Swiss-Prot record:
PPR repeats lie at residues 134-165, 172-202, 211-241, 249-283, 284-318, 319-353, 354-388, 389-423, 424-458, 459-493, 494-528. It comes from Arabidopsis thaliana (Mouse-ear cress). Disulfide bonds: none annotated. InterPro entries: Pentatricopeptide_rpt (IPR002885), TPR-like_helical_dom_sf (IPR011990). This is Pentatricopeptide repeat-containing protein At5g11310, mitochondrial. NCBIfam families: PPR (TIGR00756). Its main location: mitochondrion. Coiled coil: none annotated.
Amino acid sequence: MNSLFTAFRRNLLLNPNPHRNFFLHRLLSSSRRSSPLIPVEPLIQRIQSPAVPDSTCTPPQQNTVSKTDLSTISNLLENTDVVPGSSLESALDETGIEPSVELVHALFDRLSSSPMLLHSVFKWAEMKPGFTLSPSLFDSVVNSLCKAREFEIAWSLVFDRVRSDEGSNLVSADTFIVLIRRYARAGMVQQAIRAFEFARSYEPVCKSATELRLLEVLLDALCKEGHVREASMYLERIGGTMDSNWVPSVRIFNILLNGWFRSRKLKQAEKLWEEMKAMNVKPTVVTYGTLIEGYCRMRRVQIAMEVLEEMKMAEMEINFMVFNPIIDGLGEAGRLSEALGMMERFFVCESGPTIVTYNSLVKNFCKAGDLPGASKILKMMMTRGVDPTTTTYNHFFKYFSKHNKTEEGMNLYFKLIEAGHSPDRLTYHLILKMLCEDGKLSLAMQVNKEMKNRGIDPDLLTTTMLIHLLCRLEMLEEAFEEFDNAVRRGIIPQYITFKMIDNGLRSKGMSDMAKRLSSLMSSLPHSKKLPNTYREAVDAPPDKDRRKSILHRAEAMSDVLKGCRNPRKLVKMRGSHKKAVGEDINLIDDINERNGDAGDFE
């Protein structure tokens, strides 16, 4: 195992393309012998025969962008000494590169998790003669700023354009959709509502059709973030300003139905369903699909099957929106044979199973620990011409991560790279989680480097996990560097992560670095709240003082034992003492488990 990881580590250092390497082929041979065969479909043929581009997609900007220019600016932005602002703009001037809309778009795509750096790039590009801002790039800038919760800067950009002659060309309904969704995601309900109301008053987007679309976006954004009650109340309020005969659209009902089900409020969902029928709003396939998915989400698969029968009686077309939730619900309930039987019924439909159907089955077979069953589903979908996606393989990585099968997980990763697949952020998070939990720090750092080379920056969860592992291994300079890089990318680390590094630095006498860390943290908006379980232990002095504290508790317990005659009290005290000592010993491991785990990504 160690030699296998050593080979991979050397391979990553020497070759950015690990699939062109002897070690990889040896690993692939090992994977075929040591684990159930997980088929991986090569993408070489697809690359040689590109599909006809979809006219609805964003035009391919990469083709018109100089790779040299893109690489030069990307390397500059990844330099840890570069900070957003005028100094970065001066450094960009020194490159001599003339920015284009396509180049800036490509940078936004590549460095999406570094919003403040990208804002400086945008300001630099905008000042260049001949640079013409496009509506899609403007919306990307607004989205990037809102993602970093720099709403004030985003609004200043919007207001500047609204007041100018180019406002109607740049500030569109899509701009306000970005603002509304980002506010909702940040839990800022009233601000999301005010963004919608401002859009209603802005003449270029206040047409009735656009206003209804924005209302639906607002309700959808609030419901998806769990603010269904607020969405319902606002709909009632705005309904009072409409014509007396106004009835919410079926889409609005669908959004609220989905919201109540997502919030697990079954009574409210069923009440809304009755109101919809009372208002003679005709349900659509989406409505029935929402009901079925909602019941399945709440583990009421049998009721979902009854709704399916109701659809049949209404002679409505039954498609993937109906079958997929039922198949997933049966799988989640462990009724995998019934899920396969339902898929057989799905085959007779015109549309047939989709990638979502197969991914659901793969997910639930992996959850059940049936890796051969999941592999069979994978072979089935390939046979039927459905290409597996990164999401498909991520379910296998979840299985390997959960069951500490690091070698099998790494073997699958190599096979995907060799076949031409591009792992996504979740793939790397799961791989890093496996390696961190297995204590393979060197390999984890190399995989982290490989992830960045592929243009994927680690998110908060991945960054937290790496920093906590570095702290546990007392690699404090590396932990500080990861913390600093995260802040530069616009990520605000958790306060408990700061405390772990700070305590470690101070215990090692690294006071200068501890001061730099404190200065960095004080510049960020953050909460100083720590989990109650860990507050005393994290803030407590380490090593010698902790041992003194434990000895003091032991002496106190000894004194109590001498004078206590009640056996029940002794049992209670003993349990309390064991718990306290256990918390002292296992503190850092507990922190890592709570803050480092990715959870169950769907």
